[in-house]
Amino acid sequence: MGSLETEKTVTGYAARDSSGHLSPYTYNLRKKGPEDVIVKVIYCGICHSDLVQMRNEMGMSHYPMVPGHEVVGIVTEIGSEVKKFKVGEHVGVGCIVGSCRSCGNCNQSMEQYCSKRIWTYNDVNHDGTPTQGGFASSMVVDQMFVVRIPENLPLEQAAPLLCAGVTVFSPMKHFAMTEPGKKCGILGLGGVGHMGVKIAKAFGLHVTVISSSDKKKEEAMEVLGADAYLVSKDTEKMMEAAESLDYIMDTIPVAHPLEPYLALLKTNGKLVMLGVVPEPLHFVTPLLILGRRSIAGSFIGSMEETQETLDFCAEKKVSSMIEVVGLDYINTAMERLEKNDVRYRFVVDVAGSKLDN
């Protein structure tokens, strides 16, 4: 996409090495193409995978790196061929900003599974420039990978839906886990897990939160609306709950045993893995074959599903529980996130941090 546009200089917060420490970084946006929009960032959520990328835990990180893939902002400029958006509209950008558009996955509106997908940051654009994320004052994004924020959805509330929200919404729709009255377990109560509780309840499911301790029980039941709470270390209660759940959404992003949770599934039950776990996970096959249970995986969602997630949450008045912080607090927020010291998602007030002043 050639363009006569000049490059725009912006400021963001970048990691320079695997220490993951973020500090101010000035760089040029790629030139705006005919199908691009320029988005002034207002809010950006913090995801656990940001920590993974910043610290090179997957061995694929490149620096300087500006993280952030739960981006909410306002369109300030549009390319000559942009039909989807107008200047002044509130929009969102999630985990990917490009794909090949010609493979089987792309042709079926499953861009997130395209082998040539382009990550929102720590990747390379089609023109060879590095992608940088939402911890910055502005971004240039292809209109195909931008979604519209519903007018009745608060902007700061929309940010976590662009990753955490669609991560649970997509498998629930794909695997038909939306029948009212069915019993759904949510394993792990962090940023993704708390959205799982809220979205599952909005679909009319009976929701059981499964956690390693009872620290979050009162909040899960009284604030998030869960119907039941199960402590995974309570062997007696886990045995009593055997074969009681139709589905489990496993949101835990670190290595953990699967056997205790597979035992909770009914015959034909399904455990869907949502967390990025770099270490091997182990289980014994009789837990699967003697109950025709299955383990599946799901990765974020398509652009269509992302828009559907936003519209669904706006209609059902599903809100995320967030703590809004400034960019000057970003490193402390990352440290707290690593310790699970957040209820339940940090959202950075990027515009309020006045990066370009």
From Swiss-Prot:
- Where are the bilayer-spanning segments? none
GO terms (molecular function) for this protein are: cinnamyl-alcohol dehydrogenase activity; coniferyl-alcohol dehydrogenase activity; zinc ion binding
Q: Which InterPro entries match?
A: ADH-like_C, ADH-like_N, ADH_Zn_CS, CAD-like, GroES-like_sf, NAD(P)-bd_dom_sf, PKS_ER
Which amino acids does the record list as binding NADP(+)? Answer: 49, 167, 188-193, 211-216, 251, 275, 298-300
| Annotated positions binding Zn(2+) 2 | 100, 103, 106, 114
Highest taxon above the source species: Eukaryota
Which coenzyme or cofactor does it need?
Zn(2+)
Cofactor binding note of this UniProt entry: Binds 2 Zn(2+) ions per subunit.
How is this protein organized at the quaternary level?
Answer: Homodimer.
The job of this chain, per UniProt, is described as:
Involved in lignin biosynthesis. Catalyzes the final step specific for the production of lignin monomers. Catalyzes the NADPH-dependent reduction of coniferaldehyde, 5-hydroxyconiferaldehyde, sinapaldehyde, 4-coumaraldehyde and caffeyl aldehyde to their respective alcohols.
Protein's UniProt name? Probable cinnamyl alcohol dehydrogenase
Q: Which organism is it from?
A: Pinus radiata (Monterey pine)
